[in-house]
């Protein structure tokens, strides 16, 4: 067989594999549609068939004012690796409106220790495999994938256009960008794009030894951007795939990555739904369970010109005025005191009947009962006195006589 025949046979084989892959994709998409129909509105009804009942309970508990607003939000996740895949999974389960995924790597068996992918997805692009799984988990979420490296010139322009015009409404920017990449060059690309369009974003990462991680909330002009305080040591012009071929490999723990992803999504939800306090910087050290928090101020000599521009804009903005809290005199919560509860100062002198227990209220409410009734002080005293008196009435001689007669 000639070389041409071998190539033609290889082409036929690859075409058959491609058709089989397309068929499998269509089957999985049909299976995802059969899993459940799309839900138009989130409901707080507590039934087994409602996937949002536990999320909507946050409203009932006054944690979130309107949880369903999450369907109006668009989040971009850059990097679908150890942290990014878990982040995308959590956001999908939370019911985010639209999820945009960026990555150019493929799923490998070496990823199985930390990603939510399955071994049968090895060889697929990470964004494609993630989209399949996430669509099956929650078909209500709109998922958009981009399989390219954002650090190249052409792809950076595409990335810039996507994050600035692919919001929930066409032509609007995304609501939040989550950086889950593992290299300096990609972080700087995200930083430059967000500074240029003044977009808030979270940076995240896990250390090379897999025992520490962090998240950082970056608001251009208000907090330090990634270029304001870059790492002390940076490896430049090195492709990660080259390091893999040379046997260089960083450690990874699914626990550390899961914790970091949890912190990332938790703060993203607080930012998107306006509840709680969003951490500007939150670290995690697994060796001693240390969680440092801090706020990093922008560098007035930052190398990023857009960062300097955002700093000037922020300085000219009027400072938010803190609302004065009006002190209102507290009124009694209950008009009646059914249980006879009284507050006594610690230094109050003891009264004569301080040791006398209060009478037990038998009627404590419908559906409740007392397990037992404690004896009163007077009853205990009478019982002790009776026992003592009974012992004194019988003399020792009488007891001896009774024993001899037995």
UniProtKB/Swiss-Prot annotation:
Biased composition (Low complexity): 378-393
A Pfam entry, by short name: ThiF
CDD domains for the chain: ThiF_MoeB_HesA_family
Sorted UniProt keywords: ATP-binding, Metal-binding, Nucleotide-binding, Ubl conjugation pathway, Zinc
Annotated region (Disordered), positions in chain: 373-397
One GO cellular component term: cytosol
Residues annotated to bind Zn(2+): 225, 228, 302, 307
Binding site for ATP: 82, 103, 126, 149, 183
Record's signal peptide: none
Entry keyword Nucleotide-binding: yes
Residues the record marks as active site: 249 (glycyl thioester intermediate)
SUPFAM superfamilies, A to Z: Activating enzymes of the ubiquitin-like proteins
GO process annotations (BP): protein ufmylation
Record-stated family: Belongs to the ubiquitin-activating E1 family. UBA5 subfamily.
Function of the protein: E1-like enzyme which activates UFM1.
Protein's recorded name: Ubiquitin-like modifier-activating enzyme 5
Organism whose genome encodes this protein: Drosophila willistoni (Fruit fly)
């Amino acid at each position: 067989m000639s070389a041409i025949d071998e190539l033609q046979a290889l082409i036929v084989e690859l075409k058959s594999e491609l058709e089989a892959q397309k068929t499998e994709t269509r089957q999985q998409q049909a299976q995802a549609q059969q899993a459940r129909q799309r839900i138009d509105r989130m409901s707080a009804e507590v039934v087994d068939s409602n996937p949002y009942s536990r999320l909507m309970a946050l409203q009932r508990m006054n944690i979130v004012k309107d949880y369903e607003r999450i369907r109006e939000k668009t989040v971009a996740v850059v990097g679908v690796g150890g942290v990014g895949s878990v982040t995308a999974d959590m956001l999908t389960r939370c019911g985010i409106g639209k999820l945009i995924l960026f990555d150019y790597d493929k799923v490998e068996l070496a990823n199985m220790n930390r990603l939510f992918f399955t071994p049968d997805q090895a060889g697929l692009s990470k964004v494609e495999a993630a989209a399949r799984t996430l669509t099956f988990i929650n078909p209500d979420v709109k998922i958009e994938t981009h399989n390219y490296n954002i650090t190249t010139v052409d792809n950076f322009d595409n990335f810039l256009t996507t994050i600035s015009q692919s919001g929930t409404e066409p032509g609007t920017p995304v609501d939040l960008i989550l950086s889950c990449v593992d290299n300096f060059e990609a972080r700087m690309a995200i930083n430059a794009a967000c500074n240029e369009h003044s977009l808030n974003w979270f940076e995240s990462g896990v250390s090379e030894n897999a025992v520490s991680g962090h998240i950082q909330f970056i608001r251009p002009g208000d907090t330090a951007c990634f270029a304001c305080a870059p790492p002390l040591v940076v490896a430049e012009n090195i492709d990660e795939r080259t390091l893999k071929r040379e046997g260089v490999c960083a450690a990874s723990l699914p626990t550390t990555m899961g914790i970091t992803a949890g912190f990332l999504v938790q703060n993203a939800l607080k930012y998107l739904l306006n509840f709680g306090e969003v951490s500007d910087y939150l670290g995690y050290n697994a060796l001693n369970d240390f969680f440092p928090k801090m706020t990093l101020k922008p560098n007035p000599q930052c190398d990023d010109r857009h960062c300097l521009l955002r700093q000037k804009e922020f300085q000219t903005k009027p400072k938010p005025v803190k609302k004065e809290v009006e002190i209102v005199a507290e009124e009694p919560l209950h008009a009646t005191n059914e249980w006879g509860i009284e507050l006594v100062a610690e230094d109050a002198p003891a009264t004569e009947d301080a040791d006398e227990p209060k009478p037990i209220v038998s009627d404590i409410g419908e559906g409740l009962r007392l397990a037992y009734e404690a004896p009163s002080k007077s009853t205990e005293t009478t019982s002790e006195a009776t026992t003592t008196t009974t012992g004194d009435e019988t003399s020792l001689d009488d007891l001896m006589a009774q024993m001899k007669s037995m």
